[in-house]
């Protein structure tokens, strides 16, 4: 695995969590699972050719890594990006196995994509690319086999083209993709799911750490990002009585000591569709004219906020460094939960985990919610979309939201139980590690299914 650094990193994280626990001592048979679960059940590589707008033929490499189906049909996104390669897709597919297991829904893990740059390509050419990609992929997927979703480069438009291609090639309308349009099989609450789910998970953390005495009410929350996840997380925090003191984009961040309002977040959402930066939005929109809003160019919010209780990184990977983590701890942060995948660097996670493991009581601890658990709301609602498709029904927004909340709370409880049951930590006065809890809980779920079905013997 040395030539696959991304995959190796994901594998090592799971291994270190389960090895640094009592699990192999209690259940030696689980040791046999590691070498088996680390090898994909199937890797499909295929040629994708299409005609560009100049009438010339182009070719790219397509992939689908069908990693593990012990818990259900393979489930994971399709990525159309020039960085797509087998190591990255194996890393993402491997992570997906365990994230999907934590939802409690019947979903295995997989990932796929195409090594292509869609920038500058017309709608027509993108449609031809999607049809060419699905021409081969359609042989290997199905509602009970493999149900892909979107990812980087594959949004609602591309999902539409891919679904249309599948329907055309197979002469079958079935829930073979998630993230579909609402009037052709999609689910309500899908755009909100990751942000809402993140807040529900964080609420469960607060509830547990304070024995139900505290909630988001009055808490100061620093959020990074201003896309889908950040917007809906911020709106849910405000709904629950929290104060959102920051948002950011790739060019800088906005800080508001008195709190960003839901009206301002709606303005940011509508402006972001037109690709406006936060700097432009703060200058141009009347909702920001009288508010005490500070824009900091070229910065992330972590070192510019003070007296914060909760941090929710929702922008991109490695956006919280070790030094920024120390700044957050110094500013009083007690809860950190990741809306972005790998939002914190290993150094930052070490800072948070050290602040937790060395605390003399739960009140002084800093608690870190890992992305594997904290941001699984998106894939959870994808699973609920599959359930609705299988019944040929559409649930109300209230029902989907209720199911999402239940999934996030159950996931949190599973992480806590695994951390407590299998922990080797000496300090029992502090809070348990949710990083280890998420890794161990998800590993046990997948391992049990593989052992029961004879994948491991």
UniProtKB/Swiss-Prot annotation:
Among its keywords, does the record have Ubl conjugation?
Answer: yes
Example GO CC term: the record gives: cytosol
Q: What terms describe the molecular function in GO for this protein? A: glutamate dehydrogenase (NADP+) activity
Cross-referenced PROSITE patterns: GLFV_DEHYDROGENASE
Q: Name one GO biological process term.
A: glutamate biosynthetic process
Active site, per annotation: 111
Q: Which reaction does it catalyse?
A: L-glutamate + NADP(+) + H2O = 2-oxoglutarate + NH4(+) + NADPH + H(+)
Q: Signal peptide location in the record?
A: none
Does the record carry Ubl conjugation as a key word? yes
Taxonomic superkingdom: Eukaryota
Instruction: Indicate which residues the UniProt annotation says bind NAD(+).
Output: 175-204
Concerning CDD domains, the annotation shows: NAD_bind_2_Glu_DH
Under the heading InterPro entries, the entry gives: Aminoacid_DH-like_N_sf (IPR046346), Glu/Leu/Phe/Val/Trp_DH (IPR006095), Glu/Leu/Phe/Val/Trp_DH_C (IPR006096), Glu/Leu/Phe/Val/Trp_DH_dimer (IPR006097), Glu/Leu/Phe/Val_DH_AS (IPR033524), Glu_DH (IPR014362), Glu_Leu_Phe_Val_DH (IPR050724), NAD(P)-bd_dom_sf (IPR036291)
Which UniProt keywords are present, listed alphabetically?
Answer: Isopeptide bond, NADP, Oxidoreductase, Ubl conjugation
Sites of the Glycyl lysine isopeptide (Lys-Gly) (interchain with G-Cter in ubiquitin) crosslink: 326, 372, 436
- Parts forming coiled coils: none
EC number(s) from the headed UniProt entry: 1.4.1.4
Q: Which NCBIfam families match?
A: PRK09414.1 (NF006929)
Membership in a protein family: Belongs to the Glu/Leu/Phe/Val dehydrogenases family.
Summarize subunit and interaction data from the UniProt record for this chain: Homohexamer.
Q: What's the name of the protein? A: NADP-specific glutamate dehydrogenase 2
Native organism is Saccharomyces cerevisiae (strain ATCC 204508 / S288c) (Baker's yeast)
Taxonomic lineage is: Eukaryota, Fungi, Dikarya, Ascomycota, Saccharomycotina
